[in-house]
């Protein structure tokens, strides 16, 4: 009785319609747009996850606006591969599909997502930055294993793509010779690469949930993939700002989304008000009052500003933005995203608030570094051994030096150049409480857990003893 075949369910529906033709209309009439539709939980980056109560109006109004914004139609095809408990997938793979009527495909399993992407070829795609980082790492590993002719061709045409790919995507003018070269690159490199990524048919792709490194963002757009940034929260039913076609910038997250009001508080915190604003935190009136003002403004906890084009730029979490001892701004997430652009760096945590200089914890990407080690005849027995190898340290130091050169050119952040770093002996893990389940860094916990290592970075110590407890699930 608890498990029915679909045919049985359809037959029961037909019988009900015959017995009571007005049942459906009456059921709809009893409901209200303010009724609770779903309770989704925050990631818990700043503490215990909170249940965000969203109404039917929250979901439907924002989803209709989103479908209209990027011309999402019933002909659209998408792949739902992220947890539906996350607001991003809940909106893009359920609510928007409900109002626009497009086809949502589900992968056979988590292990077949890439294969399913290639087979389905979605034209509407959403993923957090970590997904795009992992895909880029996979591409770079494959290129390093390729023959010298393929490597040379890849790097040459990627140079062309970086120079003119974004302009071509935005329908801007480029020299005929560059357009011709880009066309050859599309045939020989970009097209096959997009097909390998399952993105050959993507018309619009979004990323959100974490800031994405400008270099990573520009890489995908240079291939002709219409990747756009949006800024949102669970509390907003996703949408706060969104980038419009032709107004895409790597350093901003777009202008206010339709029906969204945006303002910046005196302390630099971003606030918004919209039809998507959540009803309350489930059974947590204190947190609700702290986050949502009586007149409906939501405090995001993020620091940012609106530039002269009306686009929002997020600097960092408001509570994380600090000052170095020389009075200059220190924005850890901004620096970490630059570090994570490099295929050999999987995760980074930076320190500098109330310090004389900036430092960093680094997690290497084991797959990428192992591939590099094999090509350089370096043997190792596991993560800890390869992470402590002198040549691996030199590899990571080279990445950090390039980031420092970039920071040196920014008048606001030149004091944030990284002077000392540690390659951690273990990977940061959600099971150990160091990351959230969406792989966001939990800074407070890391600072408490690895306090002796942080102290060592700001002393003359060359060696320090550390004991770690690892959880396996």
Regions of interest found by a model, annotated:
Residues 1-12, 26:
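Structural core segment of the AMP-binding/adenylate-forming
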Residues 14-41, 48, 71-77:
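Conserved pre-ATP/AMP-binding loop-to-beta segment of ANL
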Residues 42, 256-324, 341:
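Conserved ATP-binding/catalytic segment of the ANL
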Residues 60-77, 84-190, 201:
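Conserved AMP-binding/adenylation subdomain of ANL enzymes
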Residues 105, 177-183, 195-197, 201-208, ...:
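Conserved ATP-binding loop and adjacent catalytic segment of the adenylate-forming AMP-binding
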Residues 277, 311-340, 369-390, 410, ...:
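Adenylate-forming
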Residues 303, 308, 342-368, 407-410:
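C-terminal boundary motif of the adenylate-forming
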Residues 347-350, 402-473:
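Conserved C-terminal "lid"/linker of ANL adenylate-forming enzymes
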């Amino acid at each position: 009785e608890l498990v029915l075949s679909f045919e049985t369910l359809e037959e029961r529906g037909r019988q009900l319609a015959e017995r009571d033709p007005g049942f459906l209309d009456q059921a709809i009439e009893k409901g209200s747009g303010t009724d609770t539709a779903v309770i989704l939980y925050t990631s818990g980056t700043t503490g215990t996850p909170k249940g965000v109560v969203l109404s039917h109006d929250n979901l439907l109004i924002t989803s209709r606006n989103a479908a209209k914004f990027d011309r999402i139609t019933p002909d659209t095809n998408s792949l739902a591969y992220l947890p539906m408990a996350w607001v991003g997938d809940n909106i893009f793979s359920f609510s928007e599909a409900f109002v626009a009527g497009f086809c949502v495909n589900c992968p056979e399993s988590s292990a077949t997502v890439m294969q399913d992407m290639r087979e389905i070829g979605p034209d509407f795609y959403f993923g957090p930055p970590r997904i795009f980082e992992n895909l880029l790492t996979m591409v770079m590993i494959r290129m390093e294993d390729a023959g010298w002719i393929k490597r040379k061709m890849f790097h040459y045409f990627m140079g062309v793509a970086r120079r003119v790919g974004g302009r071509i995507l935005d329908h801007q003018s480029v020299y005929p010779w560059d357009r011709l070269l880009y066309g050859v690159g599309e045939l020989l490199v970009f097209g096959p690469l997009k097909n390998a990524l399952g993105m050959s048919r993507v018309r619009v792709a979004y990323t959100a949930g974490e800031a994405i490194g400008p270099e990573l963002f520009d890489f995908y757009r240079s291939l002709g993939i219409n990747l756009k940034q949006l800024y949102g929260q669970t509390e907003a039913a996703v949408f706060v700002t969104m980038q419009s076609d032709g107004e895409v910038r790597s350093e901003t997250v777009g202008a206010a989304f339709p029906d969204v009001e945006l303002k910046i508080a005196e302390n630099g915190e971003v606030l918004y008000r919209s039809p998507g604003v959540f009803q309350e935190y489930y059974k947590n009136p204190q947190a609700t009052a702290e986050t949502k003002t009586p007149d409906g403004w939501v405090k995001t906890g993020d620091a940012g500003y609106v530039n002269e084009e009306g686009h929002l730029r997020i600097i960092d979490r408001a509570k994380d933005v600090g000052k170095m001892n020389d009075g200059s701004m220190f924005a850890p997430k901004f620096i970490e995203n630059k570090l994570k652009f490099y295929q050999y760096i999987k995760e980074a945590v930076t320190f500098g608030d109330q310090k004389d200089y900036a430092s960093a914890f680094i997690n290497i990407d084991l797959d990428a570094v192992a591939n590099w080690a094999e090509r350089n005849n370096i043997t190792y027995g596991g993560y800890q051994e390869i992470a402590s190898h002198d040549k691996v340290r030199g590899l990571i130091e080279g990445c950090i030096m390039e980031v420092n050169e970039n920071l040196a050119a920014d008048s606001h952040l030149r004091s944030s150049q990284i002077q000392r770093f540690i390659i951690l002996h273990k990977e940061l893990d959600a099971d150990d409480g160091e990351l959230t389940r969406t792989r966001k860094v939990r800074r407070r916990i890391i600072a408490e857990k690895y306090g002796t290592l942080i102290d060592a970075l700001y002393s003359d110590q060359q060696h320090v003893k550390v004991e770690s407890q690892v959880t396996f699930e």
